[in-house]
């Protein structure tokens, strides 16, 4: 039987499922979609979500729960900007927060002018931040982050330990990251995922980061699959994908494979057996 073009096999323990999410609508998106120059405005420094954006968060959260994804996702990785953090905790965080001295909330009430109640860190995957999945760096104030201590106050249970500097040393007012640099950063981020033990990971990031990273990785895909992978993400869109460890960066062990031959016994395959006349017997 002939196999279809492009069909292949890969060990499960060398694969991860990633759930890619673009942040919900930010205040910069509203004017920026009408006039690109609006992205240059300092009024949109580290832009937060609009009220429509929060409704988009609510809709995606409902889907994540109704589809059962909330039970599968082991880790949430967020770009350390206001709009991605708000999206990450709003979609994947716990239910309404009850003030408890020994449990910090993922988000305090009204963080980033949200007019939202605090969000619980209970019964949800951990949320961590990583700078390498930030938006296109430089020039646009909406893509500049604030100090980490500011975020830690607003998002107490989010883990910021992977961020190396208190202030934003990556964003430059007069230098825009090239597309090639952005795509290379995206590939580096995906390689970094193989240092993580988690197999099902949600990543809350940005349109430019997703578009240029995914377009740099789709060369071997069928044209129809390329369209599925590489098209621009809508606000609060989620796409589920599998990444494969071809470079042997990940674990060499599988938790689901079973070695067999327990108890031990004769198990020579039938097509390897030969009779006295050296004729293969099958």
From Swiss-Prot:
Instruction: List S-S links within the chain.
Output: none
Pfam families in the record: His_Phos_1 (PF00300)
Please give the Gene3D superfamilies that the UniProt record associates with this protein: Phosphoglycerate mutase-like (3.40.50.1240)
SUPFAM superfamilies, from UniProt?
Answer: Phosphoglycerate mutase-like (SSF53254)
Site Transition state stabilizer: give positions.
Answer: 206
Q: Which domain of life is it from?
A: Eukaryota
What is one term from the GO cellular component aspect held by the record?
Answer: plastid
Which InterPro entries does this chain map to?
His_Pase_superF_clade-1, His_PPase_superfam, PGM_Phosphatase
Q: Which residues form the active site?
A: 23 (tele-phosphohistidine intermediate), 135 (proton donor/acceptor)
Q: Which CDD domains does this chain map to?
A: HP_PGM_like
Task: Give the family this protein belongs to, as stated in its UniProt record.
Answer: Belongs to the phosphoglycerate mutase family.
What is the protein's name according to its record? Phosphoglycerate mutase-like protein 1
- Whose protein is this, by species? Arabidopsis thaliana
């Amino acid at each position: 039987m002939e196999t279809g073009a492009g069909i292949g096999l890969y060990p499960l323990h060398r694969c991860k499922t990633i759930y890619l999410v673009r942040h919900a609508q930010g205040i910069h998106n509203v004017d920026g979609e009408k006039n690109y120059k609006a992205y240059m405005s300092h009024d949109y420094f580290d832009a937060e979500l609009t009220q429509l954006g929060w409704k988009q968060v609510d809709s995606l959260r409902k889907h994540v729960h109704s589809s059962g994804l909330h039970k599968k996702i082991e880790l949430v990785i967020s770009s350390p900007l206001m709009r991605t953090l708000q999206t990450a905790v709003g979609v994947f965080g716990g239910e309404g927060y009850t003030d408890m001295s020994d449990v910090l909330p993922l988000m305090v009430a009204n963080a980033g002018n949200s007019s939202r109640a605090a969000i619980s860190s209970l019964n949800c995957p951990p949320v961590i931040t990583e700078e390498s999945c930030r938006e296109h760096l430089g020039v646009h104030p909406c893509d500049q982050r604030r100090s980490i201590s500011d975020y830690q106050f607003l998002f107490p249970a989010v883990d910021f330990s992977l961020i190396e500097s208190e202030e934003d040393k990556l964003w430059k007012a007069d230098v825009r990251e090239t597309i090639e640099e952005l795509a290379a950063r995206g590939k580096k981020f995906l390689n970094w995922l193989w240092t993580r033990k988690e197999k099902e990971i949600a990543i809350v990031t940005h349109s430019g980061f997703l578009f240029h990273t995914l377009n740099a990785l789709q060369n071997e895909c069928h044209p129809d699959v390329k369209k599925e992978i590489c098209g621009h993400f809508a606000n609060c869109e989620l796409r589920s994908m599998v990444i494969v460890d071809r470079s042997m960066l990940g674990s060499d062990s599988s938790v689901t494979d079973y070695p067999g031959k327990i108890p031990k016994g004769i198990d020579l395959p039938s097509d390897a057996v030969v009779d006295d006349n050296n004729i293969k017997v099958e």
